[in-house]
Amino acid sequence: MTMPTVSMRVNGQLVSHVVEENTLLVTYLRECLGLTGTHIGCDTGQCGACVIHVDGVSKKSCTILAVQADKREITTIEGIAEGDELHPMQQAFHENHGLQCGFCTPGMIMSAIELIEGNRDITELEIRQGLEGNICRCTGYHNIVKAIAAAARSQ
């Protein structure tokens, strides 16, 4: 049996590799492409550390096979900054101390980008509900919520 070839656009670059059928997208991103900003926390879809955008929608990459991402547009945390300039959500996390150890931060940021899209007046409750499925073991989420609200207001 031959292994499938996957082709997708990752952070604006067309990539193509032969993969095993059971390779998770998070594993493909980290091991084949060296994009280690997408973290593996639980490997079961519980923690949100692996959130990326698939065709502009937040998805947990540990729940998607690489073959399911064939011909899709993938954006990881490495693909959101403009050169040396942080993405506004990254900047808001920095300015509002929205991280401690940083392990959950890439997934939080990727989820938050979609969450605030077109919603400058998002409420704290909407932010907290929108982050369900993204776990931070270090903080009480206060500064994360503050950072997301700041990014929403700045768009």
Language-model features, listed with the residues they occupy:
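Signature of N-terminal electron-transfer/Fe-S-associated modules in redox systems
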Residues: 1-155
